[in-house]
Amino acid sequence: SSAASDVYKRQYLVDTLAVNKYNQGINYEKYPTELCEKAVKYIKEKKPTLTLIAWDNPDHVGHKEGHDTPAYYHKLEEIDGYIGKVMNAVKEAGILDETIFIITSDHGGINKGHGGKTMQEMETPFIISGKNIKKGHEIQASMMQFDVAATVAAIFKLKQPQVWIGRPIMEVFK
C-alpha cells in the first residue's frame, strides 16, 4: 500500500519498489556461489545505484572452526574470489567509473566467540575504493560500525537522521 511504502521510506530512506531481496540458498555450501551468480547477473542487467551483498559464511566458519584458523582464512579467500567476480561484473556493466566499493564486517573474533570487548573482537576491516575515494589512504580517525551507514549516506548526499550516532568518515573522500 502507499501508506506502507511511505513508512518504509521514512524508516529506510528508500521506496519498497526500489528494493530487490535475494534470500539465502537452501544449500549452505552452495549459498555463496549462488549469491555471487545472482549478484553478477543483477549488476549486469540492472546497473543498480546501490547494491548490498552480505556473505556471512566467514562468520559461520569463525564460530564453528574458530577465527584465525586455516578454515577461516580459506573461507575469506573464497569470498575474495567472489568479490573479484562482482567487481568484474561492475566493469562489464560499464559502471566501474561511477562505483564505490565498501568491504567490511560486523565484528572480529577470538577462538569461536562472537564479538566481545577486546580489540581483536571489536576491530573490523573497512575497505573503501572507487569514485572520489582517496587511493591507498589509511584511516587515521577512530571508527565504529555505525559510521559505515553514515558514510554511505554521505556518498549519496543524504541528510543523516538526527537520531543516528554514526558519523561519516570524510577523510576517505578526495
Describe every region a protein language model picked out.
Residues 1-8:
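Short, small-residue-biased leader/transition segments that mark boundaries at the very start
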Residues 2, 46-51, 95-101, 124, ...:
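Loop/turn elements at helix/coil->beta-strand transitions in domains of secreted/extracellular proteins
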Residues 9-22, 37-81, 85:
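Active-site His/acidic residue clusters
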Residues 19-33:
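Binuclear metal-dependent hydrolase catalytic cores centered on His/Asp/Glu-rich metal-binding motifs
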Residues 29-34, 70-80, 139-146, 163:
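Soluble non-cytosolic domains of exported or imported proteins
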Residues 56-58, 89, 107-108, 132-133:
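Catalytic metal-binding/acid-base residues of hydrolase active sites
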Residues 117-159, 170:
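Substrate-binding rim/cap in mid-to-C-terminal beta-strand-loop elements of soluble/periplasmic
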